[in-house]
Amino acid sequence: MKDQGRSTRKRTGGRLHDVSKKKRHQLGREPAETTVDDPRFQVIDARGSDDKLRALSTNIAQVADSGEVTTEEIENVVDNPANVNYIRRNIITKGAIIETSAGQARVTSRPGQTGQVSAVLLEDS
């Protein structure tokens, strides 16, 4: 697991010595990397009594177009500024451009955190 604690190096490059051991709440998880496929979800215990629903894969998006929100089917990922390799792997992240049955749309939600894909239809599609 990834350590989300502070860096082991100072600003100058010198080593910082550990004051305490790594704690469980400082650990992170691997990213969900939501793909375009049949819907699959994972429930994760969050801090407190909360739960997070991660979308491991989905093919449905809530697409908004001038106030109207419709449920559209995702066909594939057209562009993803987070990582160029995500395009050919069909991974959906916030800011990705997806091809839907209504046209191209930009993802506004974080599917790995919220478990759903919300998007805004692009003008030029």
From Swiss-Prot:
Ranges of Basic and acidic residues composition bias in the record: 27-36
Lipoprotein listed as a keyword: no
Gene Ontology MF: a single term: structural constituent of ribosome
UniProt keyword list: Ribonucleoprotein, Ribosomal protein
Assembly mode: Part of the 30S ribosomal subunit.
UniProt family annotation: Belongs to the eukaryotic ribosomal protein eS8 family.
HAMAP family: Ribosomal_eS8
Descriptive protein name: Small ribosomal subunit protein eS8
Organism: Haloquadratum walsbyi (strain DSM 16790 / HBSQ001)
Lineage: Archaea, Methanobacteriati, Methanobacteriota, Stenosarchaea group, Halobacteria
